[in-house]
Amino acid sequence: MKVNDRVTVKTDGGPRRPGVVLAVEEFSEGTMYLVSLEDYPLGIWFFNESGHQDGIFVEKTE
């Protein structure tokens, strides 16, 4: 995924929420995405852990 991609994010206890990627930071353990959400327009960071399906919080929408 890259900046300006439309995504959905997994949050605790609710449905996936739509957003837009504002920034991407790569790490050896996975990737951090700064995602703008309706109630967080300046963005909130989410981490996608490499190699663990349960650690995937950001997914690109079609």
Curated annotation (Swiss-Prot):
Pfam families per record: DSRB
InterPro entries, alphabetized: Dextransucrase_DSRB
Superkingdom per UniProt: Bacteria
Similarity section: Belongs to the DsrB family.
Protein name: Protein DsrB
Native species: Citrobacter koseri (strain ATCC BAA-895 / CDC 4225-83 / SGSC4696)
Taxonomic lineage of the native organism: Bacteria, Pseudomonadati, Pseudomonadota, Gammaproteobacteria, Enterobacterales
